[in-house]
């Protein structure tokens, strides 16, 4: 039987949604802040005009030129076939350019928001839930549920300090996961992270020159991880 929106609302009024409200409120009470290392690096990368994994191209692809000197209605059978291929390729590039334009607007807006708020100590999000109970932040650009670079721009405003090897293990495992090393045991992931301390420190020192983080499945979250992993291991080594 098909239900109307009002039927659904009437049904919800009979339910105990206390736990759902608690979940939403817990999310809304969680403070965030901007990761300055990531936003500064992202701005430099985006403005460089170079190709970076996880970012759209800065410029549109060139559309192919009409390959014949006569109008389509005068083409022979072989030329007509080539013309159809030309139109198909042109349409694909045109569609790709339109999508890229939308992505460029999104990333520029996201960077601008991050730069606007990077000096603010704590940020909070307004959250909503849908009919399935899934929770989403209302903000559509700079969001912990958005693109890889958007997630990397955010960190908890009340971070937990790593105090022992067991806690460090989970930071190591996170690093392996964002690099795509997630089909091996947790122990192997931890080992992988320690084997790549030097790479992480190199990224920490100069992320534009040392592009190891660009090899990751989630490159911008990998960049954020390199920063944290380098800080942790530098502190462990030098105190």
Model-found features: residue ranges?
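Non-catalytic nucleic-acid-binding interfaces of large nucleic-acid enzymes and RNP effectors
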Residues: 1-239
